[in-house]
Every structure is written in structure tokens, then in C-alpha cells.
Amino acid sequence: MAIVPKRKTSKQRKHKRNTHSALDAQNLVTCKNCTSMIEQHVTCYRCGFYKGKKVAGYTCLNDRVQ
């Protein structure tokens, strides 16, 4: 036999349980090289710079388009 709940889960209990399931907003910053919006601690997808230095072996969006 399958496991069956003893009683119905109320809306309030269900909502309380799901309060931590919401997604957080992304923390965006501006790239210091090209001023586009990027995520923190990530190489810029437009210019390929991270912390003011060009990342080796990274093909940026501008190189792919041309």
C-alpha cells in the first residue's frame, strides 16, 4: 500500500513551507571596461575582461558577431 497523508494540507501550511522557494534577484554590476551590465564575479560576455584584465582563451560576444 502507498503512503497516504493523514489529513489535507491547508493553504497556510503549504504557503509557509514554500516561502523559501522564491528566486533571488540577480546582483548586477557595470563592467569597468565596456560599461555593460554583468553578474558579479563573472567575465564580461561583451569585452572578455575580468577585474580589469583580458581573460586568456575567452571569445567575447564582439568577436563572435564579426
Swiss-Prot record:
| Keyword terms, alphabetized | Ribonucleoprotein, Ribosomal protein
Any single GO CC term annotated in Swiss-Prot or TrEMBL for this entry: large ribosomal subunit
**InterPro entries with a match to the protein in the record:** Ribosomal_bL32, Ribosomal_bL32_bact, Ribosomal_zn-bd
Keyword S-adenosyl-L-methionine belongs to the record: no
Region (Disordered) residue ranges read 1-21
Entry GO MF terms? structural constituent of ribosome
Gene Ontology biological process = translation
Q: Where is the composition biased (Basic residues)?
A: 1-19
Presence of keyword Ribosomal protein: yes
Superkingdom = Bacteria
The family assignment reads: Belongs to the bacterial ribosomal protein bL32 family.
Q: What is the protein name given in its UniProt record?
A: Large ribosomal subunit protein bL32
Which species does this protein come from?
Mycoplasmopsis synoviae (strain 53)
